[in-house]
Regions:
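Short, surface-exposed linear patches
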Residues: 25-27, 45-48, 69-72, 165-168, ...
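Glycine-/charge-enriched secondary-structure boundary and capping motifs
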Residues: 15-20, 84-103, 109-262
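Glycine-rich anion-binding loops of enzyme active sites
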Residues: 1-61, 231-233
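N-terminal hydrophobic or amphipathic segments with adjacent small-residue motifs
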Residues: 7, 22, 31, 38, ...
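Acidic, glycine-rich loop-and-beta core segments that form the ion-binding/anion-interacting portion
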Residues: 41-104
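Phosphate-handling active-site elements
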Residues: 34-37, 73-75, 166-169, 215
Length: 262
């Protein structure tokens, strides 16, 4: 059989004209009644974010351009005023100096184990609450959004159904210092940064309000910071930026409001 879809890696400025990239993709199988996605998301759901470990694997074309234009060495120290430090579990935690290069090489945090545990416990919670009769709300966890290329809003709106919107408050989490340093170093405005980097949020779960405490406890046990960052609503979205229709998905809208805490 043919497995449609996969991953196309883009490496501008890295691969030469005669170089090539080998990429792999895995396709999973799930029982239809347990499939998560926008079909489960409804007004009143809460948006919970899980902290990233840094840049993850996106936005490096902009990073390289900033560093090149600023003529900064990868081995240079980041000013202490930015508060940049190796995150929990970092392979560079014992480094004498957490340099710009090490901060940019920080491995991408994996959320697969946490997400699978939440899906299982959300399913069990729905059964215990008597919500297991074929309704869409057969799981307290309704959708996940992995924040990759394009930033938070562009990835989150892919799991918001048409007619609904997620209002995200930028002030609900602390943006890691590496992003502010790169923004200052390259003169990058908030909108450009928001559309390129994860700005501290690597994964998002959309859950039933009753399941928020269990979601945040699971993240804590996994050693990850989590925060309630927004709510799914109907009606007219509020917020100075409204993003929809990204990455070929015609769904709902993400409205970004407030100011980031740097």
């Amino acid at each position: 059989c043919a497995l449609v879809a996969g991953e196309t890696a883009e490496h501008p400025g890295v691969l030469g004209t005669e170089d090539f990239d080998v990429a792999g993709a895995a396709t999973g199988i799930v029982d239809a009644p347990r499939l998560l996605g926008p079909q489960r998301v409804c007004a009143g759901d809460l948006v919970v974010g899980f902290a990233s470990s840094g840049l993850h694997s996106n936005g490096y074309s902009l990073v390289r351009r900033i560093v090149t234009d600023a003529r900064v060495d990868w081995d240079s120290s980041i000013p202490q005023s930015y508060g940049v430090a190796a995150p929990s579990g970092s392979p560079f935690a014992e480094a004498a100096d957490y340099t710009l290069g090490l901060a940019c090489l920080e491995p991408t945090r994996l959320y697969s184990k946490l997400c699978l545990e939440l899906e299982d416990s959300g399913w069990l919670a729905a059964r215990q609450a008597g919500d297991f009769a074929g309704e869409l709300d057969g799981n307290r966890v309704h959708a996940f959004a992995h924040v990759t290329g394009g930033g938070l809003a562009a990835n989150l709106c892919r799991v918001i159904p048409a007619g609904l919107h997620a209002v995200v408050d930028r002030a609900t989490w602390q943006v890691p210092g590496i992003f502010r340093y790169l923004m200052d170093l390259g003169g990058v405005d908030v909108t450009s940064a928001e559309d390129t980097w994860n700005l501290g949020v690597g994964m998002v779960a959309i859950v039933h309000p009753d399941f928020v405490p269990a979601t945040m406890m699971a993240a804590q046990v996994a050693g990850m910071e989590s925060f309630v960052m927004g709510r799914v609503s109907d009606g007219v979205p509020a917020g100075e930026r409204q993003i929809s229709g990204t990455k070929g998905v015609a769904g709902g809208t993400v409205a970004m409001l407030g100011e980031y805490r740097f």
